[in-house]
Regions:
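Short, charged/polar N-terminal "headpieces" of proteins
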Residues: 1-28
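A short linear-motif detector with a strong N-terminal bias
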Residues: 8-10, 81-85
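Active-site- and interface-proximal helix/loop "cap" or "latch" segments in soluble metabolic
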Residues: 22-83, 90-97
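Predominantly soluble domains enriched in secretory-pathway, periplasmic, or organellar proteins
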Residues: 100
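Short terminal or interdomain "cap/linker" segment that borders an active site or interface and mediates
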Residues: 106-110
Length: 110
């Protein structure tokens, strides 16, 4: 079974969908779909990740500059990769995610 996280980047009017599928060897296939040209390199480069990639931020390929390519520093696609993989391996509850919805970032009106 796969786990999918959808992101609506309202600040740039782009959408990202990340699907993680855990394989028998414990690695994850990653499928990234987006209408953003800047994410194409990221999607083509990040097809497979390991458990270490989702648990060790310092060595994770998810955030490596050569993998991120032209993406903006504030792009939520890498966070969606973490969330989809965490959900797929049971580190984030699918039931709670379905019940409560996604993690959101909102503008604070003062």
């Amino acid at each position: 079974m796969s786990s999918t996280i959808d992101v609506n980047m309202s600040i740039c009017d782009k959408k990202v969908s990340v699907t993680a599928t855990m394989k028998e060897d414990g690695t994850f296939d990653i499928d990234i779909q987006s209408d953003c040209d800047s994410i194409k390199h990221y999607a083509e480069t990040l097809k497979n990740i390991t458990m270490d990639d989702i648990t060790n931020f310092e060595t994770s390929r998810i955030n490596k500059e050569e993998v991120r390519g032209n993406m903006s520093m504030i792009c939520m696609a890498p966070i969606a990769v973490y969330q989809a993989a965490w959900m797929e391996c049971g580190m984030m509850s699918k039931r709670i995610y379905t019940k409560c919805g996604p993690i959101t970032i909102t503008d604070r009106k003062e």
